[in-house]
Amino acid sequence: MVKARRQAKILELVRTRVIETQEELAAALAAEGIPVTQATISRDIKELQLTKVPMPDGRYRYALPEEPGAAAGERWRRIFREAVLTIDHSGNLVVIKSLPGTAQGVAAAIDHAGWPEMIGTVAGDDTVIVVVKPADATGEVAERLKGLMR
């Protein structure tokens, strides 16, 4: 595999999953059909300037270099605070209403939070749907998201 493609896949994995160790990253790459050695992973992490940031539960995960030290950086919190109008939930879904044209930015902010209970977001023009797993965590996730509005 070409180095650039492998590193692009690493960035995608770190952006979309909670990766806590080099071993987890290697396993995720292998599952995508990209076998790598620990030495290669280590070099890629250094070249991509990935860092480890704390999660709300005290564990650490790999993060992209533009993410400040917290799982949801101040830039993302500001976008969230300025754009979100309401947050509600039902079943395993959290529905977020935002200013027209801002849902994509709100969804990106949520995705950057890296909370393991949130398995994905779907954004329209002014609405974001967050899919939560397990369903009984939906209320807690909605409250945590409301906390970002403050």
From Swiss-Prot:
Keyword field contains RNA-binding: no
Protein name: Arginine repressor
Purpose of the protein: Regulates arginine biosynthesis genes.
A Pfam entry, by short name: Arg_repressor
Family indicated by similarity: Belongs to the ArgR family.
Cellular-component GO terms for this entry: cytoplasm
Superkingdom, natural source: Bacteria
Alphabetized SUPFAM superfamilies for the sequence: C-terminal domain of arginine repressor, Winged helix' DNA-binding domain
Keyword Transferase found: no
Subcellular location(s) of the protein: Cytoplasm
Lineage of the species this protein comes from: Bacteria, Bacillati, Bacillota, Clostridia, Eubacteriales
GO molecular function: arginine binding; DNA binding; DNA-binding transcription factor activity
